[in-house]
């Protein structure tokens, strides 16, 4: 079967690199901004409120999302350029989905052309939509579809 992290050692290295970059510099930054900008999440989720740090994290996430957007601008559908997504693509889709929570106010697909096309490719995949079949994700675009 297909290898989710790439077929060759080079592809596997690139997939790991992109996965780490997206997790650390995009998804984790959006998650951190969410936690430090919002109160009332409870002691297990709520970090110390710090609006300055939250805005810094939001800006950093946007800057790195711009880098990923430029990388996708060569016309590739997926980060490694293959016909199917790899693990790093799943991490990027997760980052875009989390950015779309209304309280985050950082919808990456609305800010970056190639991330928008990337997101639309995920929305066209039945297996991706099946993961949101309960329509309780908090992302209106996934929950309110016909």
Label the model's feature ranges:
Residues 70-82, 126-132:
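Surface-exposed helix-capping loop/turn segments at secondary-structure junctions
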Residues 1-55:
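GST-like domain detector, emphasizing the conserved glutathione-binding G-site
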Residues 8, 104-111:
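Structural helix-adjacent loops and short alpha-helical linkers that scaffold large soluble proteins
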Residues 80-105, 116, 122:
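GST superfamily/GST-like fold recognition
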Residues 4-14, 56-57, 74-88:
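All-alpha amphipathic helical-bundle segments outside canonical DNA-binding/catalytic cores
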């Amino acid at each position: 079967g297909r290898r989710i992290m790439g077929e060759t050692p080079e592809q596997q290295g690139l997939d790991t690199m992109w996965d780490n970059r997206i997790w650390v510099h995009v998804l984790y930054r959006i998650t951190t901004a969410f936690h430090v900008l919002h109160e009332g999440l409870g002691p297990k989720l709520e970090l110390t409120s710090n609006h300055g740090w939250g805005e810094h994290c939001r800006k950093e996430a946007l800057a790195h999302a711009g880098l990923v957007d430029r990388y996708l601008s060569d016309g590739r559908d997926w980060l490694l350029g293959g016909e199917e997504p790899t693990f790093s693509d799943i991490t990027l889709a997760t980052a875009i989905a989390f950015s779309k929570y209304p309280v985050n106010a950082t919808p990456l697909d609305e800010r970056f052309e190639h991330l928008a096309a990337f997101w639309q490719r995920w929305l066209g995949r039945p297996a991706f939509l099946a993961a949101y079949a309960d329509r309780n994700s908090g992302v209106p675009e996934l929950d309110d579809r016909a």
